């Protein structure tokens, strides 16, 4: 067997080793799996894209995250392609296209292979010329260095690509888990709300049945007494119409019966229908709209003292040394929040502990600051207040509020687009105090605070903006 035949058979064997058993083509970006078999990157990713799968060669299980680039096979493919290309071009590449002479020198300055005729020409005569073999060796070493750097970069890029693929998979799994958790939490919350609704309705039905039973009992008693009364009236009328002897017969007994008769009052306690209806999770849901409020010193009445963090305000004993600007309230101990709202949902809480008087709510940014005015929606105020032990809403006319548990903290919720301002008694499980609906805001809103006058000395406590508590 001739050397050329042996070389040909060796090349065929090498081509078989670098052929992908999936696509039957030379491997592109060869990747090794746990069992040691190697395949095209795209082919093996297609096999294992749905999770764990088995090797097409030996059926052993493998995972995509354990794939590793096979540089040995990649180099073999590149070398075999280069051999095939060199075999085809060897004749053309070894001789000068211009002179037909063998190329045996290399011009360093021009980076060009030369024959002996080219080397003697004026263009290359004064340039550095080295033998082809020597130049090839030098540049081969340089290319090897560059190749090694590029291969390491490619390996890093492939690893990063695989890491990103795994991150994408992990992220999607985490998102799906979080979605399931959110669905479960809201399903539970809806279930609790439905149960509480049923409990409240059942309690109301029970109160209704008991009240109607008592009314029925009283009606029966009243009918019985009415019948007895009618009989007594008829007896007395008969005696009056009769003879004197008949009139006097047992007259003392009849009069005693008539004098002792009385009609009981309808003393029935009606169910309390003004009591609050607790809604589970209301405070937590409201606090998802929480905004951090601070006080605007430029709007504060000159009697007010505002804390350093601008989260508390109280009535002072003397005027503060402040400028009388157009934003400042002049007649009442009022101050606005620094924040302005023209859209969205907002919620904050105010501590009114130990306060005997206060006003809270929101107002238009453009409200009157000087002189006397009333707090009403017509004047751009949506507020509730405590004054002389009475809670009221600033409607026209004012609305008396029946609050079962005196609040220590008030929650204020604004839905700008819906035109709603609601107040909640945080002390009483977040029960609703009052809601202004269908409000026409017509411009930016600001939080509103009135600490109330301290005539008796019992209203010195500050209004405090509460920190967020989830």
Swiss-Prot record:
GO terms for biological process: negative regulation of innate immune response; negative regulation of NF-kappaB transcription factor activity; negative regulation of protein deubiquitination; positive regulation of autophagy; positive regulation of cell cycle; positive regulation of protein binding; protein autoubiquitination; protein destabilization. One of its GO terms (molecular function) is zinc ion binding. SUPFAM superfamilies: B-box zinc-binding domain (SSF57845), Concanavalin A-like lectins/glucanases (SSF49899), RING/U-box (SSF57850). CDD domains: RING-HC_TRIM21_C-IV, SPRY_PRY_TRIM21. A zinc finger (RING-type) spans 20-59. PROSITE patterns: B302_SPRY, ZF_BBOX, ZF_RING_1, ZF_RING_2. A zinc finger (B box-type) spans 96-127. Homotrimer. Component of a SCF(SKP2)-like complex containing CUL1, SKP1, TRIM21 and SKP2. Interacts with CALR, CUL1, FBXW11, HSPA5, IKBKB, IRF3, SKP1 and VCP. Interacts with SKP2; the interaction with SKP2 does not depend on an intact F-box domain. Interacts (via N-terminus and C-terminus) with DCP2 (via N-terminus and C-terminus). Interacts (via C-terminus) with IRF8 (via C-terminus). Interacts with ULK1, BECN1 and with ATG8 family members, including GABARAP, GABARAPL1, GABARAPL2 and MAP1LC3C/LC3C. Interacts with TRIM21 and SQSTM1/sequestosome 1. Interacts with IRF3. E3 ubiquitin-protein ligase whose activity is dependent on E2 enzymes, UBE2D1, UBE2D2, UBE2E1 and UBE2E2. Forms a ubiquitin ligase complex in cooperation with the E2 UBE2D2 that is used not only for the ubiquitination of USP4 and IKBKB but also for its self-ubiquitination. Component of cullin-RING-based SCF (SKP1-CUL1-F-box protein) E3 ubiquitin-protein ligase complexes such as SCF(SKP2)-like complexes. A TRIM21-containing SCF(SKP2)-like complex is shown to mediate ubiquitination of CDKN1B ('Thr-187' phosphorylated-form), thereby promoting its degradation by the proteasome. This is E3 ubiquitin-protein ligase TRIM21. It comes from Mus musculus.
């Amino acid at each position: 067997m001739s050397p050329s035949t042996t070389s040909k058979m060796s090349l065929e064997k090498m081509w078989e080793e670098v052929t992908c058993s999936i696509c039957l083509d030379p491997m592109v970006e060869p990747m090794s799996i746990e069992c040691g078999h190697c395949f095209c990157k795209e082919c093996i990713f297609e096999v294992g894209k749905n999770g764990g799968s088995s090797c097409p060669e030996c059926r052993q299980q493998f995972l995509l995250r354990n794939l590793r680039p096979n540089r040995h096979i990649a180099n073999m493919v590149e070398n075999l392609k280069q051999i095939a290309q060199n075999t085809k071009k060897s004749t053309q590449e070894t001789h000068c296209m211009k002179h037909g002479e063998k190329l045996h020198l290399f011009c360093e300055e021009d980076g060009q292979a030369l024959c002996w005729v080219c080397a003697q020409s004026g263009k290359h005569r004064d340039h550095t010329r080295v033998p082809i073999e020597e130049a090839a060796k030098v540049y081969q070493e340089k290319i090897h260095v560059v190749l090694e750097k590029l291969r390491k970069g490619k390996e890093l890029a492939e690893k990063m690509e695989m890491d990103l693929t795994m991150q994408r998979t992990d992220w999607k799994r985490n998102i799906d888990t979080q979605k399931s958790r959110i669905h479960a939490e809201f399903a539970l919350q809806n279930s609790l709300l439905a149960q509480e609704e049923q409990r409240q309705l059942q309690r109301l039905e029970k109160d209704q049945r008991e009240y109607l039973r008592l009314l029925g009992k009283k009606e029966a008693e009243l009918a019985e007494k009415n019948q007895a009364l009618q009989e007594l009236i008829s007896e007395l009328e008969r005696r009056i119409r009769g003879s004197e002897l008949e009139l006097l017969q047992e007259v003392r007994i009849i009069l005693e019966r008539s004098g002792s008769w009385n009609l009981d009052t309808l003393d029935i306690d009606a169910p309390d229908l003004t009591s609050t209806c607790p809604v589970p999770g209301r405070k937590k849901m409201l606090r998802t709209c929480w905004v951090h409020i601070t006080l605007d010193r430029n709007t504060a009445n000159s009697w007010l003292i505002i804390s350093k963090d601008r989260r508390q305000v109280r009535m002072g004993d003397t005027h503060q040394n402040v400028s009388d600007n157009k934003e400042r309230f002049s007649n009442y101990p009022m101050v606005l929040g620094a924040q302005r709202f023209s859209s969205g949902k907002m919620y904050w809480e105010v501590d009114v502990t130990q306060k005997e008087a206060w006003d809270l709510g929101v107002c238009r940014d453009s409200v009157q600051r000087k002189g006397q005015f009333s707090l009403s929606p017509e004047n751009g105020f949506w507020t509730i207040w405590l004054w002389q032990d009475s809670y009221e809403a600033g409607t026209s006319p004012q609305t008396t509020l029946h609050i079962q548990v005196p609040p220590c903290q008030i929650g204020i919720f604004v839905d700008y687009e819906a035109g709603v301002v609601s107040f909640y008694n945080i002390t009483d499980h977040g029960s609703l105090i009052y809601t202004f609906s269908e409000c026409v805001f017509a411009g930016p809103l600001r939080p509103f605070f009135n600490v109330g006058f301290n005539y008796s000395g019992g209203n010195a406590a500050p209004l405090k903006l509460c920190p967020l508590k989830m």
